[in-house]
From Swiss-Prot:
It comes from Danio rerio (Zebrafish). Residues 1-21, 33-145 are annotated as: Disordered. The lineage of its organism: Eukaryota, Metazoa, Chordata, Craniata, Vertebrata. GO terms for biological process: spliceosomal complex disassembly. Identified in the spliceosome C complex. This is Tuftelin-interacting protein 11.
Amino acid sequence: MSMSHLYGRRGDEEEEDGVEIEKFEVSEWDLANEFNPDRRRYRQTKEEATYGIWAEQDSDDERPSFGGKRAKDYSTPVSFVSAGLRKTAAEEKAEREGSDDSDAEEAPPPPRAAAPKKLQTGGSFKTSQRFAGGIRTGQDLGNWEKHTRGIGQKLLQKMGYVPGKGLGKNAQGIVNPIEAKLRKGKGAVGAYGSERTQQSLQDFPVVDSEEEEEEEFQKELGQWRKEPGTAKKKPKYSYRTVDDLKAHGTRANMSMSRPAGELAQVKVIDMTGREQKVYNSYSHMSQKHSVPEEAPLSVSTREQKSSGFALPELEHNLKLLIELTEQDILQSARLLQHEKDTVVTLTHESDALQVRLAEEEETLGRLEQVMSLVERFEAGDKEGDPALSLQECAKIFEQLQTEFYQEYKTMGLGDLAVSVVHPLLKEKLRNWDPLKDCSDGLEEVGQWRAILESTLSLHSGPDTTNMDPYHRLIWEVWVPVMRTCVSQWQPRNVGPMVDCVECWAPVLPLWILDHVLEQLIFPRLQREVDNWNPLTDTVPIHSWIHPWLPLMQTRLEPLYAPIRSKLAHALQRWHPSDSSARLILQPWRDVFTPGAWEAFMVKNIVPKLALCLGELVVNPHQQLLDPFNWVMDWECMLSVSSMVGLLDKNFFPKWLQVLCSWLSNNPNYEEITKWYLGWKGLLSENLLSHPLVKEKLNEALDIMNRAVASGLGGYMQPGARENIAYLIQTERRKDFQCELQPERREVDNSATRPPGMAAVPASVPTNFKDLVQAKAEENGIVFMPLVAKRHMGKQLFTFGRIVIYIERGVVFVQGEKTWVPTSLQSLIDMAK
């Protein structure tokens, strides 16, 4: 058994192979003390000088001490030198790495304990001899502990010692002390058998010598191949399977076949690892995790490797054989993969051909059924066979559409209707008169629309090269019959033609309906309008033009200009007493545009009405109202502004002049009141609500008020002044109520409005006067102007019992001597 574990030293081979070997080569300590005069010298004995290396050596003479040679005392027990606590290989390696920096700066001479055990002096040996000789087993060893207080154990516990565990930071010390076994006699070591204790057997189990020899033999077996001075290294074998070789070949092919793009030569810096790496392209970066290839050895490496054993020719041949074998494997793998791909491709093609063959067989079967149905159309053309009716043809087409829709669309079977259905439908419509029986044949044509017309051609135009079958049917069969009928039709006989077009409109394509209205009917209407004379024709033009409005709408606008021109020419010698003009023009009011209608009336009617009002004679004693009534009959035909303009220029000046003359000749104010109210009653509410008409009527009231106040005309009937004042007050109150009626209506609406909805004012005050009027209404205060009462040209108003006037948005209240400005709230408080 090796004792190197007691000395605490292990060599490199011990660390590598686990074998404990004591090295005897020249160490650093030997080199440092080679020229040291104080180092301990070893004297050669006579026997060593005589026999040399064959001299018998005594273990006691290896390292003599300075005390001289003394006799051996074999009665003393064996003393061992403690090597301290052994550390694990990882701890020793970490300790050596940590101490490399400090040792590199300064290397002090090794202490005495660092020298090899065989070169140490005998001081320690003497001490052990004295220690061994001074102690006698069997005596009262440690009796002095009985008289102490156990201070040592207490100190150890303070420093963290736990009884039953080893000393040290990690409790790496031994728990039980080293056991010593007393030798039976005075013989040498091993003379009395094994001297190992039970503790030694547990800590260092016995290893079979044969196993040690076998291990040593295996270790030294291959030493002849190694270079001298090199440590044993286990051979490293690299295995490459066929799958690895295929994968490597696939990646190589992919990298070679990858096209060089714009970013092929971009420099990429990879900082994802511990160290910064630079790649020449993104493809290199994508391969950073792939299995690296075995790089070729450098020249120095090959020389160093081949110094012990080198056969370059053999290595070249082996490498060449390996490469050829790899190429054969890759080529075979490629051929195998190609054959597999070919098999898969052929399998897919075979399956596709089988599917296509089945589809073709099914298509052939369907085509045979289609041919059998189409041949039924030809059966009716043969001699001796009855011709097919429209109903039978419709059933065949419906069967083709429902059961063979794909073939119907791809082969254009709908075009068969041109040769099959057209003759049958022409025969049915040959004797048809649209003006007598407009619904004849409508059901059959509607049935064929559902069969032949496609949704894509609903809004298509007339394209003779690619026309829908149904559109072609209508265009070639129905339109010629309709064209013949329209050419013989009288536009004034509007009813039958309008009924016919309205009846057939749902089944006609849009472009065909437009063609009938624009190309067939409109030219006939235009020709008839050109021949129309409003002075001689007894039938009004609107009676045969207006029925076309729902169908033609804006298409009739080109006819309106000639109609207005003819009507204007007919009104040149017209007088308002002739009411026929109003009957002719009234149906056209909603047909013409508002601008065109207003221009026509201003140019042709208003001047005639102005002349009629000019001829009106206002005579209070014998009044003729026919001219005035003739003008008022046109109120519904004219705009309010036109009527007010007529009255302002041609009626009110004459009417006010007659009133002034009457008031200056001792009038009867009761008759004047009735006369005023009579003329006012002839005006409509729309005219009375106009500001200009209100102004003229108020002017008449002012004239009457001034006449009563000044006593103009001499004698005045009793109560005339009060009657006139009452009339004025009543008229003003009516005007005031008319102004407030929209606001009251808004108040009523707000009362019935549900809570949470904000009231929207019907009219927003536009000036300060309107605001004062609104506040007066809110507080129930009467606010009205005073007749013929002014102050410095400003109208005076009564606000309750207070007289005020308004100037520049400020209310002035009449005081004792002057007019005082006040606020609106103060005015309301004073009025209450």
